[in-house]
Amino acid sequence: LVTTNPANNAPLSIIATGVFTAGGVDHPGDKVDTVVFPNGTFKIAHSNGTGTQRFNAKTCLGTIVLNGTYRLSGGTGAYAGISGHGIYRLNILIVAARNAAGKCSQKLPPTAFQQIIRAQGPVSL
């Protein structure tokens, strides 16, 4: 999953490979995401994850790394009967904007944001 939009509910680009290959959109939720591919949909239930957050006040660079688990279910169309589970790793890089005084600001929108989630585990259809 990849996004460059810092909004919490922004759709994410998703590419799946393995048992099937497809590209589509992930609609994130607090505990369950909905994945929409051209031939159907399914749900990804996920843990919040645990990890680290760091911010460098000199460079305005923030990093977040989280590891967690997920489970697939609720498939429709080509994904009816999908099941699977596994682990994920979330990486976020943020470059905070600087305010008029030249200090990093958490109130202004970031100048750059990148989120990448890599997941792996067995899947059955």
Model-derived regions: residue spans:
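Beta-strand-enriched cores of mature, soluble protein domains
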Residues: 1-125
